[in-house]
C-alpha cells in the first residue's frame, strides 16, 4: 500500500520549510557552521529527538525548530533546505506544495528579509525545474511576536508569495492580536 500511495499525485498545503529538514542536512549544516547546540550529532538519536511527540505540548515539540532555524541563517543553507524539501515532496508523489516559513526568524545573523525570501523563492524556482513539482511560498508571522503587520507587508511586496499565515504557540497568543494583519492579508494576498 505504501508504494501505491507514493504514486498518487498529491497536494501539500501546509508544509513548514524550517520544520522538515533532513536529519543529515541538519547535522551537516551544524558542523559546517560550528553550531554547537544540537542535542546529538548521532543521526538516529537526533532523528528520534526531533520527531513530534503526540503526548507532548506544542511548545515542547517546537523546541526542535530552535535547531533547524539555528542552521538556516545564511542564503546557501536556506536555498539548500528549500531544494531538498521539494525533492523529498516530489519523491513522495507531491505535485503541488505550499512551503511556509517565518522569514523574520532567519535574520539573527544579519540577513535581510529580501535575501531570505529570495533564497526560498530561488530554491522553489530551481526545484520546480529540477523535480517536476509546482510550489509556492507562504510567509508566517509568529503569534508570540508583534510584527505581523511587517510580515503581511512582505507578502504584499513579493509577487512570488502565495499566502500569509500565523504560526507558533497558540496558548496565550490570540489571533485577535493580529487582527489587522489578517485583515490586510485577506484583502491583498
Predicted feature residues:
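Metal-cofactor-binding active-site regions of metalloenzymes
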Residues: 1-186
Amino acid at each position: 500500500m505504501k508504494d501505491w500511495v507514493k504514486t498518487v499525485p498529491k497536494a501539500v498545503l501546509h508544509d513548514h520549510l524550517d520544520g522538515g529538514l533532513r536529519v543529515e542536512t541538519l547535522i551537516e549544516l551544524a558542523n559546517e557552521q560550528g553550531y554547537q547546540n544540537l542535542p546529538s550529532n548521532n543521526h538516529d538519536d537526533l532523528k528520534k529527538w526531533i520527531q513530534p511527540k503526540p503526548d507532548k505540548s506544542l511548545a515542547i515539540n517546537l523546541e526542535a525548530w530552535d535547531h533547524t532555524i539555528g542552521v538556516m541563517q545564511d542564503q546557501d543553507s536556506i536555498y539548500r533546505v528549500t531544494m531538498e524539501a521539494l525533492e523529498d515532496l516530489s519523491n513522495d508523489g507531491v505535485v503541488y506544495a505550499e512551503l511556509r516559513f517565518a522569514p523574520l526568524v532567519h535574520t539573527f545573523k544579519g540577513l535581510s528579509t529580501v535575501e531570505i525570501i529570495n533564497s526560498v523563492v530561488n530554491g522553489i524556482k530551481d526545484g520546480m525545474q529540477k523535480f517536476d513539482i509546482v510550489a509556492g511560498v507562504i510567509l508566517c508571522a509568529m503569534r508570540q511576536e508583534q510584527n505581523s503587520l511587517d510580515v503581511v507587508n512582505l507578502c504584499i511586496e513579493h509577487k512570488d508569495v502565495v499566502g500569509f499565515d500565523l504560526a507558533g504557540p497558540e496558548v496565550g497568543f490570540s489571533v485577535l492580536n493580529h487582527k489587522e494583519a489578517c485583515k490586510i492579508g485577506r484583502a491583498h494576498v
